[in-house]
């Protein structure tokens, strides 16, 4: 969006101009909106000046700047074609507006116009009143899955080219969100499933996200049914992964295809998936399930004296062991890595599970002694009591007697428990086809999985860009709402990348949100309506830097006056 000044009837005004693609005409069309007078603020009596509100500048302006660098509105409009209300906002304008709302002031879409009115920076030159929830939901029913996937690939290509993101290692993971449903319209996305929030009264929508190695920037996502499998969603993304692979090469200006690696956890293990990833051009790095035969072999190797060795550099506090073995029909490098944080978490989990199991085992012991439990029922309930947290490996049970009069004894074997902690707990088995990578590089790449987990924390309830609470009842609305949320996450991540700050995303957005214009109404002594003037705040060093980087002064030129050095007193 371009901001300039124009004289009208002897008065100068600041004008915002925007170019939007019109699919019907097959060309771009121009829009303009008046931002306000360009004249300097009037001289006024402070005793008669009153504040009448504030307007957002920093957070909205920063995300609008990032969206303009990627040409998000144009990218979406070109992919989706002539989608949008007649004379109203296009699909690109609606989605970008909702994405910025989710990141700056999460709320219902019926409050979208109010949110846009509360900001000095503008997403569109159209009046805020045309950005309604009804317009969003109508557009959502016209956009297809394929169009959203094409838009994701185009946006990822633009992000890599503009912000020079590292994409040699990409991390993939899934989560789910619960949503309210009150409609008789059949849908495929919101299903009964195991919600991460532990709520059973709501339906679940799944989300799989592919994240860049640097910046926590989501490059590709997929919405899927809440009762779907993790492997299924990754397999459904294979075509998108292939297109993304080619688009990233173009964005980085490579003459030869890059060697990219896809990182994921053990829930995505599948021999067939390993082969399919190789076909679409990706190397693989995965944390094998510990019950896998190759993982068992690697753990036995790592349990030998002197097998676990400390790594160098930033990973000098990490110990790992390495071997090469056949995993199914393919040759892979296995790395057993030790994590004290994981070990402590598993020990806490075992302590809680063991306490519950002891209560159940004592109850079974009493029922058996009273002759109120058959052997088959006893065996089944003992198996259920010891099913979690490796309890069956160190809680020794003995069931004897007859089918109708069984006997039951149990004990906790401290030696077996110590052996479990020494050889299995706190350890992951990493499996990769990157045979030439060093052990440190493999461990560092797998730690990139944290990028996805951090992104999910930002999208959960109470997070920076929350997905819910959601009342998007139809599948189309759920898809486009999720797209806007992921886009909001990407805008925040890119804004943090541009500033290069060490602070986390939440303090960064809070600092940007502190750049607000205070509206004051004053009396000049002349005739006519009392003028309303925007006053700039006192800025910190970080906020002054953000004003320059994100060009916030184009929306609020008076911000520059806050950045001038104070005169020295003689």
What do the PLM-derived regions correspond to, one by one?
Residues 1-93:
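Conserved glycine(s) in the ABC-transporter nucleotide-binding domain "signature"
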Residues 3, 11-14, 28, 77-570:
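Anion-binding and metal-coordination hotspots
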């Amino acid at each position: 969006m371009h901001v300039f000044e124009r004289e009208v009837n002897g008065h100068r005004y600041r004008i915002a101009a925007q170019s939007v693609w019109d699919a019907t005409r097959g060309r771009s069309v121009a829009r303009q909106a008046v931002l306000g007078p360009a004249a300097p603020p009037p001289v006024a009596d402070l005793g008669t000046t009153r504040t009448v509100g504030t307007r957002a500048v920093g957070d909205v302006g920063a995300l609008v700047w990032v969206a303009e660098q990627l040409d998000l509105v144009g990218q979406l409009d070109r992919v989706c074609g002539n989608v949008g209300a007649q004379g109203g906002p296009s699909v690109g304008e609606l989605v970008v507006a909702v994405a910025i709302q989710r990141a700056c002031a999460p709320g219902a879409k019926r409050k979208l116009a109010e949110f846009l009115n509360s900001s000095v920076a503008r997403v569109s030159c159209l009046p805020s009143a045309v950005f309604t929830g009804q317009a969003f939901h109508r557009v959502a029913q016209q956009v297809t899955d394929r169009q959203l996937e094409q838009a994701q690939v185009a946006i990822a290509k633009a992000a890599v080219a503009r912000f020079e993101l590292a994409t040699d290692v990409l991390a993939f993971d899934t989560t789910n969100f619960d949503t309210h449903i009150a409609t008789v319209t059949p849908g495929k996305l919101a299903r009964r499933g195991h919600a991460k929030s532990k709520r059973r009264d709501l339906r679940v929508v799944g989300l799989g996200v592919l994240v860049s190695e640097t910046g926590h920037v989501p490059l590709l996502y997929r919405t899927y049914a809440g009762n779907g499998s993790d492997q299924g969603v990754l397999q459904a993304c294979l075509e998108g992964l292939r297109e993304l692979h080619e688009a990233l090469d173009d964005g980085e200006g490579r003459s030869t295809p890059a060697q990219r690696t896809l990182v994921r956890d053990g829930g995505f293990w599948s021999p067939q998936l390993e082969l399919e990833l190789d076909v679409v051009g990706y190397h693989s790095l995965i944390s094998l399930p510990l019950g896998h035969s190759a993982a068992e072999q690697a753990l036995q190797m790592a349990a030998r004296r002197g097998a676990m060795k400390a790594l160098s550099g930033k990973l000098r506090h990490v110990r790992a062991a390495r071997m090469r073995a056949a995993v199914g029909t393919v040759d892979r490098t296995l790395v057993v890595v030790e994590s004290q944080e994981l070990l402590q978490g598993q020990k806490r989990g075992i302590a809680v599970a063991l306490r519950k199991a002891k209560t159940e085992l004592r109850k079974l012991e009493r029922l058996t002694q009273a002759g109120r439990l058959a052997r088959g029922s006893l065996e089944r309930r003992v198996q259920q009591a010891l099913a979690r947290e490796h309890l069956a490996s160190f809680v020794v049970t003995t069931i004897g007697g007859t089918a109708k009069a069984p006997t039951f004894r149990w004990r906790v074997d401290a030696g077996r428990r110590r052996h479990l902690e020494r050889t299995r707990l706190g350890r992951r088995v990493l499996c990769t086809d990157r045979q030439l990578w060093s052990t440190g590089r493999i461990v560092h790449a797998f730690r990139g999985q944290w990028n996805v987990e951090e992104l999910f924390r930002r999208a959960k309830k109470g997070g920076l860009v929350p997905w819910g609470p959601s009342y998007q009842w139809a599948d189309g609305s759920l898809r486009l709402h999720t797209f806007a949320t992921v886009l909001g996450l990407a805008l925040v991540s890119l804004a943090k990348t541009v500033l290069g700050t060490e602070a986390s995303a939440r303090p960064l957005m809070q600092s940007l949100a502190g750049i607000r214009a205070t509206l004051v109404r004053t009396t000049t002594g002349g005739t006519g309506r009392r003028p309303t003037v925007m006053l700039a705040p006192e800025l910190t060093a970080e906020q002054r830097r953000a004003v320059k980087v994100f060009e916030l002064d184009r929306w609020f030129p008076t911000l520059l006056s806050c950045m001038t050095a104070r005169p020295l007193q003689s």
